[in-house]
Structures are given as C-alpha cells and as structure tokens.
C-alpha cells in the first residue's frame, strides 16, 4: 500500500515531482478525487495515509534529533522490521509481474489528481519502486540500522491500523469523512 510513494520516481524536477505533489495535497480533497478511480488502489493508499499520519511525527522527530543520510527511509524500514517481528510475520513483496499488472489501474486513479501522468510513466515508477523495495528487503536476515526504541512508534502504528480501517471503509463507501481525512 505505497500510495503516492511510487511517484517519487516520476519526473526529474524536485519541485514538480509527482510524488511530492501528491503528498502535498489536502487528504480530504485527494481522496475525493481518488475514490473515483480504482477502489483497491484507493483503499491501499488510505491505509498508507493512515499509517503515515500516525507514525510520521515519530519519524520526523527522529530526523530532527539526529544527523545522517536517508534517516526517514531507515527509520521506516526499521519500524517495518520491528512490526514484522512483533507480529511474527516475515516481510514480503509481491512478484514483479503482479506489481506491473496494476499499471493501468494505478495510472487511471492518479490521473484523477494529476492528469498529465501517463501509463508509461506509471509503469516506469512501479518498476523503480519495485527495485527500490527489493533492495530494501534484499537479505533474509534483516538487522536494524538505527539504534532506536520503536515501542512508542509501535503504539502510533497500532493507532494507524485503526485509522486505516476507518479510512478504507470511507473509501469503499465513497464517503470521504473529514474527521478521518484531516490528519495529514
């Protein structure tokens, strides 16, 4: 459920990067548009939105208190490992073919927000994001990169799951509740 993150790989310009533009949208307005696209993609994005809304304050606080490259990505990767270990579940990634099979559904949804996005550009983003994710999960034996206590962030993660359930219900009912989609 990567939502707009795959579009960080769309476009060369930092200022006009599709991923950045999508993340700057007001959540309620964004989901009002997305709900008219592919329901599964929109629901997945709703879970991503919910988790980001609840967890990002911890990620940003860590970034603000520490120096280093890619702290945001490292923190989120470590949190994913922490959650998977707490749940006793191995992290997995969909096969490449299944990811790429979503190209047109994803593109059709994003065009509701950014009309200039093309199917070819979407496919390119999905390929790059898939490769990035594979690199992140490249080894079976995964270790934490940061020396951090994720227990408080885990509580925020649990709140994000609860919010995610509500957000998905809103999306599937095509009723974008202002209370749910005002956390961004």
Question: What are these model-derived regions, one by one?
Answer:
Residues 1-184:
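N-terminal leader/auxiliary helical segments
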């Amino acid at each position: 459920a990567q939502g707009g993150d795959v579009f960080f790989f769309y476009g060369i310009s930092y200022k006009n990067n599709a991923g950045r533009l999508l993340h700057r949208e007001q959540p309620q307005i964004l989901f009002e548009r997305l709900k008219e696209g592919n329901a599964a993609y929109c629901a997945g994005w709703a879970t991503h939105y919910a988790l980001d809304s609840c967890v990002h304050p911890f990620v940003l606080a860590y970034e603000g208190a520490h120096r280093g490259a890619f702290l945001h990505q490292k923190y989120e990767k470590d949190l994913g490992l922490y959650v998977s270990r707490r749940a006793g579940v191995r992290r997995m990634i969909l096969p490449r073919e299944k990811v790429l099979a979503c190209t047109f559904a994803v593109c059709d949804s994003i065009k509701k927000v950014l009309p200039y996005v093309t199917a070819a550009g979407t496919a390119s983003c999905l390929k790059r994001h898939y490769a990035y994710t594979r690199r992140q999960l490249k080894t079976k034996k995964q270790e934490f990169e940061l020396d951090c206590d994720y227990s408080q962030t885990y509580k925020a993660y649990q709140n994000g799951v609860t919010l995610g359930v509500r957000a998905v219900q809103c999306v599937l009912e095509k009723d974008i509740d202002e209370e749910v989609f005002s956390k961004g």
